[in-house]
Amino acid sequence: RGSGKVTFGNRPNGFYYARIVNQIPFEKILRGNPHRSFAVNFRCKPFFYHGDVNQLTITESIASFTNPGTVYSLPKLTVTGSGEVTLMLNGKIIDLDFTGISGSIVMDSELEECLHSDQNASAAMSGEFFRIPPGENAFAWTGSVTSVVIDPNWRSL
């Protein structure tokens, strides 16, 4: 039994998160004949994640982008900056305080974690983690930001 990403032949351009729910008969597989057949049963989470999605790198304080999915995505944002920073996505606000932090802060909306160098940086963040709705989205920031890299995790039902 295991879990991970699974891609099906009828939807080769992405994947589901799934886990195997039945026993795989490895002892039968390993006995001589290399051509064995057996069933593998998966329990999949409901979202189809779009494959081959490029990260969005934003270097200007105002930008827009489109979520091609049919449901909101839970992005991972890597913000490089200094001082006090405000991020805005469609009017929703996250404040970041880089005091004592050099480099980047990573905000993972799926895990609801805010990290700096793999260490908890929750105290540096104020606001709710972003969800990117389907369609056109407006993004902006104020403060001293070098870049925002968004791993969008586009998905559909």
Kindly give the residue locations of the regions a language model identified:
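Intrinsically disordered, low-complexity segments enriched in serine, threonine, and glycine
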Residues: 48-157
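Short beta-strand and beta-hairpin "edge-sheet" elements
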Residues: 2-46
